[in-house]
């Protein structure tokens, strides 16, 4: 599993000189380019850091094989970007450009642009992809009910609270495009592994989450549904009449009870659909090896659905992003008498996703103990420096660390490790589960 996160970037200036988003992004990545000779690099912890289309910094975690490991490495991405932010602000100050840089782990900006949080799952090549997409699509359309990041949407009539930031920007169900049409599931076949054994399922519909528990639920529930599909579990047919209309309808309904149209004229609510998937997950747990992390996911999944059904969120208001955010807005409105259309609510919405510690609203809530965690600061710090020790990422991270220490010129990607010397020595690592490889050890020893 892995998560790719694009960050929103902006800068407020104290003086007269202004910088475009492109220029701000270049300041952010100046330190990266100075050592990596590129704005597209792999790090010692196995992750990829690069400047994506539209001046959005993007962090792709290393391959992870457990949910807690993935959450730690996702949070490590925030720390890596925060370091770049602090360094860039110092450079601006040195050049007499007073300004504060903001990086937001969200999915929309004030101009209506959207940027993503993509989940990657390694699935077996065997079997029909259409079965995966048929079962997964209704799940993903309604999953925002349990793991949306929440958003205040300004409409011509009034401001309204929505479950998902990403839902309004999705235009296809299944497609090979990522930016033009923004599908729910991307079918571009780039397994980054042995293509005869595996395919990489690329889910681009999810919101960027701040709460660790929500990230764990988002990825863990999807991974469990995929596991059940591969195990041959049968699901009720929830094929949607129009997934693009449905995803918006679900996002606008915090009760989860409004019916969406299914194929053939049937109807079901988001709550109905999620209840079915959750019930199958509970049943599946009885037949699989015990895993406390997966059990934690299924427990939170069920509690969140119960909270939505009862419209009583007290038992999940420290664990689910959209619930945390909605409670924050309601308290702010009660205190100041604002309605949702007030610019200060929009400002609070954005500040929730500010990744700078001590400034971002989510970080303030976390420091006050108002959101639940599954990591420790120490484990996140470790993930900033070190790759997962149980996947191929360890080979990549060890190789990069050794090559940098030896001052060697090298090239890496997800599957290749290459020393750029006269011999052009390259090792191909096609097994994402393999963390020990004699060929890589010999390559490192040769430096």
UniProtKB/Swiss-Prot annotation:
- Provide the GO MF annotations for this entry: ATP binding; ligase activity, forming carbon-nitrogen bonds; magnesium ion binding; ubiquitin-like protein transferase activity
Q: Which reaction does it catalyse?
A: ATP + [prokaryotic ubiquitin-like protein]-L-glutamate + [protein]-L-lysine = ADP + phosphate + N(6)-([prokaryotic ubiquitin-like protein]-gamma-L-glutamyl)-[protein]-L-lysine
| Record-linked InterPro entries | Pup_ligase (IPR022279), Pup_ligase/deamidase (IPR004347)
Which EC class, in a word?
ligase
Where's the active site on this chain? 52 (proton acceptor)
Q: Where does Mg(2+) bind?
A: 4, 50, 58
Keywords noted in UniProt:
ATP-binding, Ligase, Magnesium, Metal-binding, Nucleotide-binding, Ubl conjugation pathway
Coiled coil segments of this chain: none
GO BP term (any one): proteasomal protein catabolic process
Entry's EC annotation: 6.3.1.19
Q: In which pathway does it act?
A: Protein degradation; proteasomal Pup-dependent pathway; Protein modification; protein pupylation
Q: Which residues bind ATP?
A: 48, 61, 414
Q: Which additional comment does the entry carry?
A: The reaction mechanism probably proceeds via the activation of Pup by phosphorylation of its C-terminal glutamate, which is then subject to nucleophilic attack by the substrate lysine, resulting in an isopeptide bond and the release of phosphate as a good leaving group.
Instruction: Write out the function statement from the record.
Output: Catalyzes the covalent attachment of the prokaryotic ubiquitin-like protein modifier Pup to the proteasomal substrate proteins, thereby targeting them for proteasomal degradation. This tagging system is termed pupylation. The ligation reaction involves the side-chain carboxylate of the C-terminal glutamate of Pup and the side-chain amino group of a substrate lysine.
| UniProt record similarity statement | Belongs to the Pup ligase/Pup deamidase family. Pup-conjugating enzyme subfamily.
> What protein am I looking at?
Pup--protein ligase 2
Q: Which organism is it from?
A: Rhodococcus erythropolis (Arthrobacter picolinophilus)
């Amino acid at each position: 599993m892995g998560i790719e996160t694009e960050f929103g970037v902006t800068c407020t200036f104290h003086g007269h000189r202004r910088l475009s988003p492109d220029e701000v992004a270049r300041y952010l990545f100046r330190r990266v380019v100075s050592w990596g000779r590129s704005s597209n690099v792999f790090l010692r912890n196995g992750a990829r850091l690069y400047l994506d289309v539209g001046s959005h910094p993007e962090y792709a975690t290393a391959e992870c094989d457990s949910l807690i490991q993935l959450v730690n490495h996702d949070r490590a991405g925030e720390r890596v970007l925060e370091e770049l932010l602090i360094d860039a602000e110092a450079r601006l100050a040195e050049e007499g450009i007073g300004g504060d840089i903001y990086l937001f782990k969200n999915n929309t900006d004030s101009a209506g642009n959207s940027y993503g949080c993509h989940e990657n799952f390694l699935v077996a090549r065997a079997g029909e992809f259409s079965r995966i997409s048929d079962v997964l699509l209704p799940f993903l359309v309604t999953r925002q009910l349990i793991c949306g990041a929440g958003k205040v949407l300004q409409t011509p009539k009034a401001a309204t609270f929505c479950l998902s930031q990403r839902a309004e920007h999705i235009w296809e169900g299944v497609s090979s495009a990522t930016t033009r049409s923004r599908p729910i599931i991307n079918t571009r076949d780039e397994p980054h592994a042995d293509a005869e054994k595996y395919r990489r399922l690329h889910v681009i519909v999810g919101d960027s989450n701040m709460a660790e528990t929500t990230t764990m639920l988002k990825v863990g529930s999807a991974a469990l549904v995929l596991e059940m599909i591969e195990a041959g579990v049968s699901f009720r047919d929830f094929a949607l009449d129009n997934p693009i209309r449905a995803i918006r309808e679900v996002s606008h309904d915090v009760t989860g009870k409004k019916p969406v149209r299914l194929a053939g004229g049937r109807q079901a609510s988001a709550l109905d659909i999620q209840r079915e998937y959750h019930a199958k997950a509970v049943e599946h747990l009885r037949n699989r090896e015990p895993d406390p992390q997966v059990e934690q996911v299924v427990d939170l999944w069920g509690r969140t659905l119960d909270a939505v059904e009862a419209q009583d969120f007290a038992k999940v208001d420290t664990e689910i992003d959209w619930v945390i955010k909605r409670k924050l807005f309601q308290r702010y409105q009660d205190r100041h008498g604002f309605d949702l259309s007030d610019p200060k609510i929009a400002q609070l919405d954005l500040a929730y996703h500010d990744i700078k510690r001590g400034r971002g609203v989510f970080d303030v809530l976390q420091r006050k103990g108002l959101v639940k965690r599954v990591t420790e600061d120490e484990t996140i710090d470790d993930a900033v420096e070190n790759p997962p020790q149980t996947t191929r990422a360890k080979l990549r991270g060890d190789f990069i660390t050794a090559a940098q220490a030896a001052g060697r010129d090298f090239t890496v990607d997800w599957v290749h490790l290459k020393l750029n010397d006269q011999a052009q020595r390259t090792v191909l690592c096609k097994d994402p589960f393999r963390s020990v490889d004699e060929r890589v050890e010999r390559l490192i020893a040769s430096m």
